[in-house]
Amino acid sequence: MLTYILDSSAYLRLIDREAGDGRVADIIEHHTQQRARVIISAIQWGEIVKIITSRGRNLTVAEIAHDLRTLGIAVIAATADRAERAALIGLKYKIAYADAFGVELAFDSPDHVLVTADYGVKPAEPDMKIEFLPTKPKQ
């Protein structure tokens, strides 16, 4: 069974109804039908909380957390081992540390696919599966 790792950009595309939101919704639907699994790293979850809170939107962190729990999306802890691997991944591919946590999860298995709208992780693409969401249209 495929496991999709949503990074913060993918989840925010869904919340904000931006380019690629339909694909993220499809992935979550496959998860709820037990045809795929969806996970997110605790670090990426923290980014989502920070961004939503900073926007001052009507959508609260508690509501988003409730959605994750209701959908059964697992938040994977940032253990010391994962943090060390993410640091090395960040150095190897020259990607941001927080982004490296999603990449690190994708390296766990050949059945893992990172879903992102962040093209900064592109250097890791030759060594793992990454599904890039479309870029936002220019305004």
PLM regions with names:
Residues R37-I39, L71, V113:
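Short loop->beta-strand "edge-of-pocket" segments that line small-molecule binding or catalytic clefts
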Residues I73-V113, A117:
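Active-site neighborhoods of divalent-metal-dependent phosphate/nucleic-acid chemistry enzymes
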